[in-house]
Structures are given as structure tokens and as C-alpha cells.
Regions:
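Acidic, gly/ser/pro-rich intrinsically disordered tails
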Residues: 1-13, 20-32, 39-45, 49, ...
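Structured N-terminal alpha/beta-domain signature
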Residues: 17, 72-75, 110
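A positively charged, amphipathic N-terminal helix/segment that binds anionic biomolecules
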Residues: 54
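Short, compact, well-ordered microdomains
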Residues: 85-90
Length: 235
């Protein structure tokens, strides 16, 4: 659990993924990477982009992997720009995984950026949480870094829904959950974070189990309902 008060924003993911393509060189935001499309393994796979800095030990571990290889990866989570539909995991840890394993964990510390939008069923609500990132400008004359904001879409149920709904716009929140993949009205996939825990640090496909058929526990729908005896909403 992250200590309180929190002074910074961050987003981090640990997942077991299967590579969908061969690893290739890629450049973005003035940095060189190795990159491959992958999918978080499970009953409901989630498409992600897996990256590693080109000169990192994670890149060396990733370089010779083949499509279909299963990997445990952990690192910074961000969203593909400009649409923000596909999660990116920039791995600092890469290791081999077994077929019966499942892991899909996301921690986000950011600012609430929208009012709550309830599902038609009333069983869940969705809000956006902003996480700012900075990178060096490719212009040598530029003195200020370039700021990019990732807007993570958060889906919450049960008591977790109540906590997320009660948070003020601009509040600093900590979200613990997992990536899920949804489809919009045009049939285009996009990602959400299904919240297991929501904690407010400073004011200003619901029922399925994506780990079904594996040895993992803690991903059934009940694990995302929250508990009535958790910390109060304004903790």
C-alpha cells in the first residue's frame, strides 16, 4: 500500500502477457525502445504494447522472444497517444511465465478529471483519472520538458463505486485494479481499469473473471466490490 500523503503521480502495471508479434525497434518521445504488441493472458485478453528502453537489461531479455512466448512483465503504465485506447507497459522487469499463471495488476496515482458516469444498470460507475508524464523535447533549444497527460478510464463496482463517486473532481486518488478491454459503439476496442480498491488521498464487463481456468485467485467479480468496513471515503 502506498504511504499517505502522496506528492507525485504515477502509474505502474505488472502482468503476464503473450507476445502477438516479433519484437522490433521503435522510437517515441525522443527515446529508443524495443516494442511488440502483446495480450494480457486470460479468458478476456487485453491488447497492450510492450516496450523496453533499448539500452536496458529488460530490452536484452525481450530481444530474442518470439510470438506466443508468455512473459511476466512489470513497469510504467501509460496510454498510446493520441487516442489513449491501448495501454503501454514499459517494462523494467521481464521473466518467463507458465501457461497456468495469471497476473494483471495496475496501480494508478492521479487526479480525478471528470464527473462520475453511471452505467445504465446502475451497478458500476466510470471516471477518468489523469497522470502526467514528462519527457525531454527533441528541440535542443527547448528549456522546458514536454508534458503528456494519460487519461485512465476507471470502472468501479459496489462499495468501491461509492468511494469513487464521492471523490471530488481534482482529488488525488490511488487506484488498484486490473486492465480490461471494452468495445465502443463503433466496435473499436479501448481499455478500462477495473478498480479493486479506491483510496482518496487529498480532496480539492463487470461480472466475469478474466483469470478463469488458471491457478490465480483474487480476480473474481466479488473481489472488486470493496468492503463496507474499509477506510472511510474521506480517509
Amino acid at each position: 500500500m502506498l504511504a499517505c500523503p502522496l506528492q507525485h503521480l504515477m502509474s505502474y502495471a505488472s502482468s503476464i502477457v503473450a507476445l502477438s508479434e516479433r519484437v522490433s525497434a521503435f522510437s517515441a518521445e525522443g527515446k529508443d525502445y524495443l516494442q511488440a504488441e502483446a495480450a494480457i493472458c486470460g479468458q478476456e485478453p487485453v491488447t497492450v504494447l510492450l516496450r523496453a528502453y533499448a539500452d536496458s537489461v529488460a530490452a536484452k531479455a525481450l530481444a530474442d522472444r518470439n510470438p506466443g512466448d508468455r512473459l511476466i512483465v512489470s513497469g510504467e503504465a501509460s496510454l498510446q497517444q493520441p487516442d489513449g485506447d491501448v495501454p503501454i507497459i514499459t517494462a523494467s522487469v521481464v521473466s518467463s511465465a507458465f501457461d497456468d499463471q495469471y497476473l494483471n495488476e495496475v496501480v494508478i496515482v492521479g487526479r480525478i478529471g471528470s464527473d462520475a458516469k453511471d452505467a445504465e444498470s446502475g451497478k458500476s460507475t466510470r471516471r477518468s483519472v489523469a497522470v502526467n508524464r514528462f519527457y525531454r523535447s527533441p528541440d535542443p533549444a527547448a528549456q522546458e520538458p514536454i508534458e503528456v497527460t494519460d487519461w485512465f478510464s476507471i470502472r468501479a463496482f459496489g462499495f468501491t463505486k461509492d468511494r469513487l463517486t464521492a471523490a471530488d473532481v481534482g482529488a488525488l486518488v490511488e487506484i488498484n485494479g486490473c486492465f480490461t478491454q471494452m468495445t465502443n459503439a463503433e466496435g473499436k476496442p479501448y481499455s478500462e481499469v477495473k478498480a479493486r480498491m479506491v483510496r482518496v488521498h487529498r480532496g480539492s464487463k463487470g461480472g466475469s473473471n478474466p483469470a478463469a481456468g488458471t491457478s490465480a485467485v483474487g480476480y473474481d467479480h466479488e473481489s472488486f466490490q470493496g468492503q463496507p468496513d474499509e477506510c472511510p471515503i474521506n480517509w
